[in-house]
Amino acid sequence: TYRGSDGRTSSPLATMKNALGRCGEESVFTVSALRAVGIPARQVYVPGWAHTDDNHAWVEVWVDGRWYFLGACEPDPDLNMGWFKEPARRAMLVHTRVLGPYVGPEELLDASSRYREINVLSRYAQAKPLVVRTVTKDGLAVKDVQVSFELYNYGEFYPLAKRMSDADGCCSLQTGFGDLLIQAQYGALGAWCKAQVAMQDTVILRLAPFPGQDRIVDLDFSPPITLPALDDTIPVQTYERHRVRLRHEDSLRSAYEATFIDSCSAARWARDLDLPADTLWTFLSASRGNHQEISRFIHDALQHHRRLLWPLLRVLSEKDLRDAGADVLLDHLVNAAKTIVLERDPDFYARYVLNPRLRNERLSSWRSLLVNNLTPAFRDSATVDPELAVEWVRKHIHVDDQDNYYHVPLTPAGVWRLRVADTLSRDLFFIALCRSLGLPARLDPVFEKPQYCPAGTHQWRSVCWEPETRLPAATANLLLSSQDPSILRPEYGTHFTLARYQNSEYVTLQLEGLSLQKSPLRLSVPEGEYLAITGNRQTDGSVLTRMMFFHLPPAGEKPLRLSWRHTSVVEGPLALLPPASRVYGVDGAEIDLNDLAHDRGLILAWLDPGREPSQHVLREWQELRPLYENWDCPIIGFIQESQRERLKACRLPKQLQLASDPENGLHRRIESTLGSIALKEDPVLLLIDRDEKIVLIHQGYQIGVGLRLL
């Protein structure tokens, strides 16, 4: 079943072992399962939606000479069905990778000697080629200009594809009928513009010195319009057979999940081992199908180095707990204990020395290999002067950025043995080497460059592999604040981002988790040219952006007050809640919706917890639970009885009350009052004010609904 998680993709067997995964993991699992029984299959991917801040992956399967699509682990009655079918009709790019020297009719997006990346958007949505022509200020064509076709998503302009202009200064991309930002870079020259693909066939970019002066630019970006829904009507008998299969599949998964360790067993084990029961249960419950490995690690760790057990487990992510092997964790615990460490801050030590995770790779055993192969002389000298570790890596590890074509990092053990690595794998190896020496090390969270702390300090120093790649020594303080109280929780990567101009392009700073809920916020960053982007996503999927270009001088402090644009159009009520709207709670008690709305307002929600769009809403309600409970607006949720079991693990706002809507009677009555608006896509959410007016309708797949309702 679906559960959102971090960016690391679990293996197919780990996904099966834990009975859950996000869309990328579910699609990798399904493709692997189909291929395992001889059925051709491939993963297709939308790198970013135009109408909401998210991406998605699903599966295509080859049947009788053609490709059909299906949801990864979300069965439908037939092929070419799925909740994502309608969102995909509004996509700007859908692509897949084909192994080998594939030659076909699809547009080629990327190629290497081992694979081709192809554009399959036209299988799902209306598409057309958008031509970009790069010229000088006098109109002369410029060849070999890098052109980036970018889509607003997650608070930044994400590059869907990059092209090089030909001798006529032209390049193109087959894309959807929405808006894109087009950027061109040619040495010290550049240009950018908004492209309205539905209205333009060609855009012309005139290259000029770039970046220019400080300025603010406001632009609106619209996704492809919503088209009338395709008819997916299936015979009643077929649908009933499908529901029977779903119930059987759910029972199989539930029976398997029942084999996971339970709280009573964990409590007994905690007593036997003299461990805190709550702490033990926190880790064992999170480990799901991997509980035997985590249990074995805990048991064996107690025999070796009990004091490091909890610190190591606490730095692991939930996904690590679900697929890390006991032997891997023991390798790090036992060999970290052998290392003399000068660090006195236990939390700092756990995060940057003990931690087996380097970035988002699968955890592996590397500490014992490095600890046992580093000579005492090197260990002693490098601990005193970590630049000796930098010099050792520079001298002994050859960098090859061509042959690791899938960009999956090599393990540090593999780099040690091969003495060859791509740039990222080299950087991760250096971090592993430092931690094996007992030195704190990490990837800089802003620019993802390797850093270390000299022994006994908390002063991060960036590694310089080559003189020309040195980060600017001069830094400055950026004082960020929000001047818009209507944005309740300005979140980085949702409402705003920052990018620094380097290597002829704006590179988004990696500041995940940053929030301006309590501002101002001081950031220490290198001086240079910056771009701040704010975006306000509208209910129709369009976004109002503000781009702030500015220079940050060295050794100074610059206040930056972020602001968000708002529509000047005030929408009236869409309809009224029908009179005498009554439903029944799960306890059988009658609920008068008109009275409820008149008292405190009301949210009505038709949800399918088995589908990803509804699961996003439920997850947002959990994250925003304090805000919702403080608001105290009643929420009536209509969920099929067979799906209510899925809510038991959710910590939802206390005012959410489940109810039944037999034969969708209330749903149909409300739909009849809305005229041309059909409530067909999962989920459906209505916000009703105290005058019983329906003031907001949300339906279908969209991120950020939880905040929008507030």
Stretches found by the model and what they are:
Residues I636, K648-D682:
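Short, internal strand/loop/helix patches
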Residues E681-Q699:
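A short, hydrophobic beta-strand/beta-hairpin element that forms part of a small beta-sheet core
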Residues T1-A14, N18-A111, L181-Q183, P376-S381, ...:
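Hydrophobic/aromatic-rich core segments of domains that either
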Residues K128-G139, G169, A474-L488:
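A short, amphipathic beta-strand motif
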Residues D64, A167-L189, A195-T202, L514-V543, ...:
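Short Pro-Gly-centered beta-turn/loop motif in secreted/extracellular proteins
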Residues N153-T175, Q502-S519:
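Short, acidic Ser/Thr/Gly-rich low-complexity loop/linker segments typical of extracellular
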Residues L593-V617, W621, P634-I636:
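Short active-site neighborhood of thiol/selenol oxidoreductases, capturing the structured segment around
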Residues T1-N18, Q237-L418:
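Secondary-structure boundary elements
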